[in-house]
Regions:
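Catalytic strand-loop segment that frames the active site of acyl-thioester-processing enzymes
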Residues: 2-61
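HotDog/MaoC-like acyl-thioester-processing domains
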Residues: 1-2, 6-16, 96-142
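Sparse recognition of residues in long alpha-helices and their boundaries
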Residues: 33, 50, 86, 115-116, ...
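Short, intrinsically disordered, mixed-charge
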Residues: 36-40, 75-79, 127
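Hydrophobic beta-strand-centered segment that forms part of the acyl-chain substrate-binding groove
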Residues: 52-61, 67-105
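Generic structural detector for well-ordered beta-strands
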Residues: 21-25, 91, 107, 138-140
């Protein structure tokens, strides 16, 4: 994934309906790095022989690896710098396999001006456009 600079948006400049996204191809190296970082070595993620016997038919990425891409969009693009993650609801709807290209998208649903809060829909789709993760985030924007 390319290095990007966090976008600097003022709270007042963020509007309901604004969207941002980030796409990434998920690799074996990503999955292994996530396993090493978190200590989650569940064999469905790291052992191909084991994973072949599961309903997935092979290794899949950790759900939270996929969800982590949402954090990247929120922190780097919308709402960007000076935003604090307060809450995240997630529903994992399908697997991410090695080689899949996933796109994390956020969309501003609501602003709560008196608390400088932003509520966003958070979703991830795969290269076929299938929704694989859906949720809602609440952030505080300075």
């Amino acid at each position: 994934m390319e290095q990007i600079t966090a976008r600097e948006l003022a709270y007042a400049d963020i509007k309901v309906g604004d969207k941002a996204e980030l796409s990434k191809q998920v690799t074996d190296a990503d999955i292994m790095a996530f396993a090493n970082l978190t200590g989650d070595f569940n064999p469905v993620h790291v052992n191909e022989e084991y994973a072949k016997k599961t309903p997935f038919g092979g290794r899949i990425a950790h759900g939270m690896l996929t969800a982590g891409l949402i954090s990247a969009v929120l922190g780097m693009k919308l709402p960007g710098a000076n935003a604090i993650y307060m809450k995240q609801e997630l529903a994992f709807l399908g697997p991410v396999k090695i080689g899949d290209t996933v796109t994390a998208t956020v969309e501003v649903l609501e602003k709560i001006d008196e608390k400088s809060r932003i509520i966003l829909r958070t979703s991830v789709t795969n290269q076929a456009g299938k929704l694989i993760l859906d949720g809602k985030a609440t952030l505080m924007k300075k």
